[in-house]
Design a protein with these regions (language model features):
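Catalytic centers of hydrolytic enzymes
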Residues: 1-215
């Protein structure tokens, strides 16, 4: 079996009809979870942007490890849709309203933060953003934040933005501003929000150009 045949077999398995699940989604486009030539992940970007728009947030920031699979063109059962996010380590969703300066500090601290659980050391561990483009510099031991753009313009440090957060990025924001008002979105998780959006019959949002790495 050559590489193309192996890929087709894998895609067929991912999209095969689950006997336990009757509902299927027909994806019109295909997005890869692998890094693209700009160091972004199209599938992760599509999923996060879909959820951000569903929750009426302007921006979103999430770790890469919540997104686990490519989106394959064609029919896909709801149970397979659930496997596109890390259900075993799912995260609640939070919404905060903070200014551009705090968003800059959030991204800056996320890139620099280091503890026994997680530290960004290579491009594969960069976060997934939506509604904004994060421009980073590659350093000897990781990455530093150079700039953030919203609608192709530098983020307005004084303007207030609504931002969708996961457990991890919410915790980083709390370190920056312990008094910040952050609202948990009920029992909604990243995985349940993604699955619910697809079960409603909509197509995933197009991936965004959300990351730029300067050497």
């Amino acid at each position: 079996m050559d590489e193309t045949q192996a890929y087709d077999a894998f895609r067929s398995t991912m999209n095969s009809k689950d006997s336990k699940g009757k509902n299927t989604i027909n994806f019109e486009n295909e997005y890869s979870i692998s890094l693209n030539d700009k160091n972004g992940r199209d599938a992760a970007s599509s999923i996060l942007t879909t959820i951000r728009e569903e929750k009426d947030a302007q921006l979103a920031l999430a770790p890469y490890y919540y997104f686990t699979s490519s989106i394959y063109k064609g029919e896909c059962t709801c149970s397979r849709v659930g496997l596109m996010t890390a259900k075993s380590s799912d995260t609640p969703l939070y919404l905060a309203k903070i200014n551009g300066k705090e968003i800059y500090e959030l991204a800056e601290k996320y890139l620099a933060d280091s503890d026994e659980k997680f530290h960004i050391t290579n491009k594969y561990e960069l976060p997934i953003a939506s509604g904004m483009k994060i421009i980073v510099r590659q350093e000897e031991n990781g990455f530093s934040l150079k700039d953030i753009e919203v609608n192709k313009k530098k983020i307005d440090k004084e303007k207030e933005y609504s931002i969708l957060l996961t457990e991890t990025t919410m915790s980083v924001l709390k370190k920056i501003n312990p008094e910040c008002e952050i609202r948990r979105l009920g029992n909604t998780t990243l995985s349940s929000a993604w699955t619910a959006a697809m079960e409603n019959g909509q197509q995933p949002s197009a991936p965004e150009d959300y990351i730029e790495v300067e050497k």
